[in-house]
């Protein structure tokens, strides 16, 4: 059971961060709050801040794929996958049969090492692992690697012993780095970063129902984190930002989500001064898997400085593509099919 609990934690982690753009805008945390509202001065900056920050949050929660369009599309790092690659290394290093050893060292493809320290508390039914990477490279193509340095921690709890977690967490220590030589991307954690998850499946309190239908809160905090993609970079911080996702029989939808909390964002090409974004979902977003985007939902950023609204003009929310409206300072700056929205890659 111990290996099953930990494996479930890692699979959950992979789901929540599969998009990789978590790290692009990611990592924030205590002390980021307040202050820098009002630095968004034009509609291009508003579109960039909104689109890229939502992409960070939604991709980190596994709600969208790397090829996502619309309000969740990202410009830098959306195709990344630092945690996914870390989990591949973990699965290679962990024993495949029997009880997990308390410590194991794995030699990486490039000669570096990954050391795994594992523990299990039978009283709380919590499995934990700490992975320390020392120039550990996993092959991504001929003579090219994804390289890790630093420390990452996982934990997961299964109180009712059904092999589905009620809660879990991931944390990365300051100084952790990821370099993808194949994609020319890098992720650099300039502060501690953490993700915690709490489940809300009825009767069990599990994160998901056993059929990969999730109902959970995901809270992100720590950082800042900087991602590079060629000549571009983005830096950001999560300030106890909570993302809620429900795929477990939501009313009139296949899924629903909302986001609340603080997020600090900066990039090298558009929002060059750091801005603090305070998110408040005033109407939960709902969507169907048969179309790209949500048919209802309203998000307020910085007390309606920026507003994103999803709507369905033809009353066919699961059949035809839905619309996205963006307002900046009360003025409409985008109102079209959500798939036609892409954050600008320059604001000059």
UniProtKB/Swiss-Prot annotation:
Keyword terms: Plasmid
UniProt name for this protein: Uncharacterized protein aq_aa17
Organism: Aquifex aeolicus (strain VF5)
